[in-house]
């Protein structure tokens, strides 16, 4: 863990800056070799941070960016070393440790165990008799990573009509044109569970099971289950799901994983999956979907398919084909899930949803370096669009809510399984992008389904949509 994370970089830096320097001092200046070793160690240990955001690469080149960092590091260290050796070493060590210290302080402030989570909103909700759940159906929320809408898929060149037909034949309502108010998995899905526009805690805190929606269902006798492929979604807050997998959080695997990212040169979005066997996750997923429990269950899972781009800032030649292959895998998984649920839990509420878009247009990542006028409808769909389909049991009188974003899932469910039919309007979040839209789509936003800014300013985000546009 922490010891591993600190000791390995120290050994690495010492080896490059002193051991190799001593060995090669016979062939050149000891001082210049030491400075070169320090500069190289500094750049390598900060490589993941340097390359993390492709939009900041100089001239759009990772190679040029890394080279300039090395030259600048060497120059700064040389000047400091010429002035005062002690100051040089203190400055380098302080800079390397400052990131870890700041991260630790921020994490501690988010997760102070002495703080009692405010439950005022929960208590207010539970006091109102009409908010009591009267249709205690099992609820299954199946999140498919970056699963796009039909309109967006057609733009990419992928025909998903067969899957749509399968869903409709199995009593699913397709909410065409749905999108998320967040463009990342954590920001998007945490708000599905917490139902808050501005989150007061780290996003992982809510995915740990500390969320309003889960508390409401627990208070109504539900068992909550959170199933994930890896602990990427779990932060250091207490994990409050009644049952969950894996039994780790993201901090437990930090040392080796972060060092691996450093020496690879960048943070892969799926690097946390490397230590976890997907077959175990899939087996547990199938077991939960096929099991029957005396108590009502709220089951939540987030799978890996179809997946999104590799976020390097340059689209791979086979980027779309990789996504299409992922779509095929996701569709097979979806069919299996639905067949299992229809056989074992036919009266359950089933949600099929994407979390955000796959990032396949322009540079296949964030668009902050683009002029806003260059950002079109499909660029926005590509980052914020998210598929949504819901199977409503036939004995529920489903209200005609204007479902528009994936964060509408639980406001709609609670409005339909309680006697409070206006709960949807009371709980729904803003129909706009809530964070990072300056980075993701160069400041373009969406308000109530209409694009604000960019090439398609004042036009609907989706032409093919199930909801009514409201000003």
Regions found by a protein language model. Give the residues of each.
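Active-site-proximal alpha/beta segments of enzymes that process anionic O-linked groups
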Residues: 12-39, 46-49, 53-77, 136-141, ...
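Metal-dependent active-site segment of extracytoplasmic phospho-/sulfohydrolases and closely related
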Residues: 140-141, 330-370
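Loop-to-helix transition at the N-terminal end of transmembrane alpha-helices
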Residues: 1-11
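Active-site His/acidic residue clusters
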Residues: 235, 292-332, 359-368
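Active-site rim elements
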Residues: 201-204, 318-327, 338-339, 374-377, ...
């Amino acid at each position: 863990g922490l010891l591993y994370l600190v000791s390995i970089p120290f050994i690495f830096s010492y080896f490059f800056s002193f051991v190799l320097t001593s060995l090669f001092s016979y062939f050149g200046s000891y001082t210049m070799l030491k400075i070169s070793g320090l500069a190289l160690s500094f750049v390598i240990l900060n490589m993941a941070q340097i390359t993390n955001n492709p939009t900041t690469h100089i001239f759009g080149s990772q190679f040029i960016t890394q080279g300039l960092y090395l030259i600048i590091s060497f120059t700064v260290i040389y000047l400091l070393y010429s002035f005062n050796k002690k100051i040089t070493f203190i400055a380098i060590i302080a800079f390397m440790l400052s990131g870890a210290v700041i991260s630790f302080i921020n994490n501690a402030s988010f997760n102070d165990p002495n703080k009692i989570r405010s439950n005022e909103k929960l208590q207010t909700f539970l006091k109102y008799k009409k908010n009591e759940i009267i249709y205690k159906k099992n609820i299954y929320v199946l999140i498919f990573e970056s699963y796009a809408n039909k309109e967006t898929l057609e733009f990419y060149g992928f025909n998903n009509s067969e899957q749509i037909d399968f869903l409709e034949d199995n009593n699913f309502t397709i909410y065409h044109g749905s999108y998320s108010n967040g463009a990342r998995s954590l920001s998007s899905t945490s708000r599905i569970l917490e139902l808050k526009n501005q989150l007061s805690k780290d996003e992982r805190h809510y995915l740990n099971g500390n969320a309003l929606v889960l508390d409401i269902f627990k208070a109504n006798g539900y068992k909550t289950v959170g199933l994930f492929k890896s602990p990427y979604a779990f932060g250091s807050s207490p994990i409050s799901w009644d049952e969950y997998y894996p039994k780790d959080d993201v901090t437990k695997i930090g040392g080796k994983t972060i060092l691996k990212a450093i020496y690879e040169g960048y943070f892969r979005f799926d690097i946390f999956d490397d230590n976890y066997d997907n077959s175990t996750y899939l087996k547990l997923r199938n077991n939960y979907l096929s099991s029957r429990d005396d108590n009502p269950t709220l089951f939540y899972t987030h799978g890996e398919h179809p997946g999104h781009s590799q976020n390097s800032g340059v689209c791979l030649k086979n980027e779309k084909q990789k996504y299409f292959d992922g779509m095929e895998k996701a569709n097979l998984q979806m069919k299996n899930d639905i067949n299992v649920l229809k056989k074992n839990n036919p009266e359950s509420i089933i949600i099929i949803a994407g979390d955000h878009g796959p990032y396949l247009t322009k540079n296949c990542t964030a668009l902050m370096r683009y002029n806003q006028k260059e950002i079109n409808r499909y660029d926005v769909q590509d980052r914020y669009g998210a598929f949504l389909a819901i199977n409503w049991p036939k004995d529920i009188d489903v209200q005609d809510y204007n479902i528009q974003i994936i964060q509408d899932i639980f406001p709609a469910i609670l409005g339909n399984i309680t006697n409070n039919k206006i709960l949807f309007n009371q709980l729904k979040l803003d129909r706009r992008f809530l964070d990072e839209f300056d980075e993701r789509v160069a400041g373009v936003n969406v308000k109530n389904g209409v694009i604000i800014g960019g090439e398609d300013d004042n036009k609907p985000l989706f032409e093919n949509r199930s909801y009514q546009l409201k000003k």
